[in-house]
Amino acid sequence: DCPSDWSSYDLYCYKVFQQRMNWEDAEKFCRQQHTGSHLLSFHSSEEVDFVVSKTLPILKADFVWIGLTDVWSACRLQWSDGTELKYNAWTAESECIASKTTDNQWWTRSCSRTYPFVCKLEV
């Protein structure tokens, strides 16, 4: 069973938090709520529809943090001519992913920006 103020879908519980935090603080906050709780992860379009039905009425049109970060670190980047990336001019800020509550488009955002968020807990 889900905690009393969490919503249930499939084998998971969800809670929308309106307070705005940066990505790291939001993930830490989720972990403090319950053992096994983290920022939201999506595994099906049906799950997305459920989450949108919960977040949109509360947050209106806004972004929420989801549990993706540093997507580029897993990529082996190279130039279009096939040469290896040895020089780069990336900003020092790490990128995290926020989901738009209106249509579930995922956007890279600076991890230091503050957004509301959704915590997810496996039952």
From Swiss-Prot:
Gene3D superfamilies: Mannose-Binding Protein A, subunit A
Top-level lineage group: Eukaryota
InterPro entries: C-type_lectin-like, C-type_lectin-like/link_sf, C-type_lectin/snaclec_domain, CTDL_fold
Annotated GO biological process: venom-mediated platelet aggregation
Keyword Hydrolase carried by entry: no
Disulfide bonds: C2-C13, C30-C119, C96-C111
Gene Ontology CC, one term: other organism cell membrane
Keywords attached to this entry: Disulfide bond, Hemostasis impairing toxin, Platelet aggregation activating toxin, Secreted, Toxin
Domain C-type lectin: 9-120
Residues of the signal peptide: none
GO MF term list: toxin activity
Subcellular location: Secreted
Free-text tissue specificity from the UniProt record: Expressed by the venom gland.
Role noted for this protein: Snaclec that induces platelet aggregation without any cofactor in a dose-dependent manner. Its platelet aggregation effect is blocked by echicetin, suggesting it is a GPIb-binding protein which binds to the same or a closely related GPIb site on platelets as echicetin.
Subunit and partners: Homodimer (non-covalently linked) of heterodimer of alpha and beta subunits (disulfide-linked).
PANTHER family named in the record: MANNOSE, PHOSPHOLIPASE, LECTIN RECEPTOR RELATED
Protein name: Snaclec purpureotin subunit beta
